[in-house]
Curated annotation (Swiss-Prot):
Coiled-coil stretches: none
A GO cellular component annotation in the UniProt record: extracellular space
Propeptide feature: residues: 30-130, 174-176
Post-translational modification: Elastase is responsible for its maturation.
Pfam families associated with the record: Cathelicidins
Signal peptide (UniProt feature, chain positions): 1-29
Keyword flag Signal: yes
Domain of life: Eukaryota
Disulfide bonds: 85-96, 107-124
Protein name: Cathelicidin-2
One GO BP annotation of this record: defense response to Gram-positive bacterium
Length: 176
């Protein structure tokens, strides 16, 4: 009888541990990670976009200060790039390759990490066209022609001392 009670209490204890193990991960899994929230924002951007092709996350800027409240809005900054997948594609976004000359857009805004409160405020603007453009060759810029630099001639501070002019006395040599 005692062994039945021990096995029954052991069964109850393991059942409680199992239930506790199932409940705790689901409570902690409710909050999205920063990256997951940004990926959801990219999905929402693709849904609202009128572009011909879908966009995929290219680069995610560093995460902001870790606020423990998943309901607060967190600032985000990331870049998306145009993919080969058309908007009507049912293919998962992760399987879409980036378009070779695809547009890159810089996106900034706010997201919440609470999946039940899907609030995204994202604005994306074209950053650049990712095309290789050879540099334009221009002749070197030369300054206009100036004569060589010469310092200005300054008059002496005091005029040189000359003896006064005296006409010669008497006949001039060579004159008769």
């Amino acid at each position: 009888m005692e062994t039945q009670r021990a096995s029954l209490s052991l069964g109850r204890c393991s059942l409680w541990l199992l239930l506790l193990g199932l409940v705790l991960p689901s409570a902690s899994a409710q909050a999205l990670s920063y990256r997951e929230a940004v990926l959801r924002a990219v999905d929402q951007f693709n849904e609202r976009s009128s572009e011909a092709n879908l966009y995929r996350l290219l680069e995610l800027d560093p995460t902001p200060n870790d606020d423990l409240d998943p309901g607060t809005r967190k600032p985000v900054s990331f870049r998306v790039k145009e993919t080969d997948c058309p908007r009507t594609s049912q293919q998962p976004l992760e399987q879409c390759d980036f378009k070779e000359n695809g547009l890159v857009k810089q996106c900034v805004g706010t997201v919440t990490l609470d999946p039940s409160n899907d609030q995204f405020d994202i604005n994306c603007n074209e950053l650049q066209s990712v095309r290789f453009r050879p540099p334009i060759r221009r002749p070197p810029i030369r300054p206009p022609f100036y004569p060589p630099f010469r310092p200005p001639i300054r008059p002496p501070i005091f005029p040189p001392i000359r003896p006064p002019f005296r006409p010669p006395l008497g006949p001039f040599p060579g004159r008769r």
